């Protein structure tokens, strides 16, 4: 079915059942599936494909040749009804692909607000992304990955399935991430290592200078190899320390205490 409303180009194809706000703009040769919902002021440039049971929040803009809501790239997927939810004011640039979930991962892929997905980036099935995330050109996020708020991922990065990327962290270009990344950390290298605290990110979020200094001290204490304490003992010592009252320190400790399928990216030994 072709709809020719004022904001929908006559060459666009919108299937029966799609829910599209009157304020949306749909450009030439876009294809919108029957289970798609587009909230207010969503803008699609030309040749965008939105499929599956997909909700896209208000103010989100999608550039040409992106495929959003496509079936999961998972051999176990057998056609079950799963979903993709995208929040408000996201920028999805050219040739981006984002998949719906699978039954094995809860059935939902979710993305928060104010994220930027640069050209050629990919978000796999069952991923959970927070707000204010930047994923640079041609980076690929495998299935079941959790990315917390305010994360910046450089170009040509690959993130292995089931990894967790902590809040406020920064991953340098070309990294192959196969372990969890601690909040507020800076990760560099093709075989990535923890190079320190993401000072720029902390300043941007408005962290106090004295709190940043204490967080740097916590990182040093966690990964120093002096004395007889093992890593778990060092972590527990900080858990009972007055440093634990600092918001950023508390986030780091709680992240590291959670159960995970992966270990942590650590400094080079």
Locate the predicted segments by residue.
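Structural signal for interior beta-strand "rungs" in well-ordered beta-sheet cores
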Residues: 3-193
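Terminal amphipathic alpha-helical/low-complexity segments used for targeting or macromolecular assembly
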Residues: 1-11, 16-17, 23, 59, ...
């Amino acid at each position: 079915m072709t709809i020719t409303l004022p904001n929908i180009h006559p060459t666009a194809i919108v299937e029966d059942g799609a829910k599209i706000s009157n304020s949306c703009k749909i450009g030439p040769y876009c294809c919108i599936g029957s289970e798609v919902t587009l909230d207010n002021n969503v803008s699609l440039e030309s040749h965008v494909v939105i499929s599956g049971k997909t909700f896209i929040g208000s103010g989100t803009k999608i550039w040409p040749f992106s495929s959003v809501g496509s079936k999961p790239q998972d051999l176990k997927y057998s056609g079950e009804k799963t979903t993709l939810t995208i929040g408000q004011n996201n920028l999805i640039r050219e040739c981006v692909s984002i998949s719906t979930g699978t039954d094995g991962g809860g059935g939902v892929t979710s993305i928060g607000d104010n994220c930027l997905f640069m050209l050629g980036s990919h978000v796999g099935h069952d991923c959970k992304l927070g707000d204010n995330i930047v994923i640079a050109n041609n980076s690929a996020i495998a299935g079941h990955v959790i990315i917390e708020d305010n994360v910046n991922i450089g170009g040509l990065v690959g993130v292995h399935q089931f990894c967790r990327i902590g809040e406020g962290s920064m991953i340098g270009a070309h990294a192959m991430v196969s372990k969890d990344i601690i909040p507020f950390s800076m990760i560099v290298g093709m075989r990535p290592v923890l190079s320190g605290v993401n000072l720029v990110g902390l300043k941007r979020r408005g962290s106090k200078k004295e709190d940043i200094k204490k967080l740097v001290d916590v990182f040093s204490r966690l990964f120093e190899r002096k004395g007889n304490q093992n890593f778990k003992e060092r972590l527990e010592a900080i858990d009972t320390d007055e440093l634990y009252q600092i918001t950023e320190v508390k986030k780091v400790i709680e992240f590291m205490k959670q159960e995970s399928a992966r270990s942590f990216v650590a400094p080079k030994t």
